[in-house]
Amino acid sequence: MVQSTPETLGSLSKLMETLAMALVDLPEQVTVNEIIGENTTVIELKVAKEDIGKIIGKQGRTAMALRTILNGASTKLGKRTVLEIIE
């Protein structure tokens, strides 16, 4: 298992930023904020109002896929990570 450090957790937020920028029409308005707790890290993803539907997807499928990717990567680091999509 890889030891989780702020650098490796930062790579998770960079991963979410890269994926979100590929999905939206206004990639310059994608912002990612990371809140590191003792056991859990929260990654807040904010996109333009016009792009929120593209990030959530039909019936939340795209958001679920993003969370699955994030959970898989964070499990390898031995950390629990939550993705919050902010309007």
Please give the residue ranges for each predicted region.
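Short glycine-rich loop/turn motifs that provide flexible caps or phosphate-binding loops at active sites
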Residues: 52, 56-59
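An amphipathic, aromatic/His-enriched active-site/gating alpha helix that lines ligand/cofactor pockets
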Residues: 62
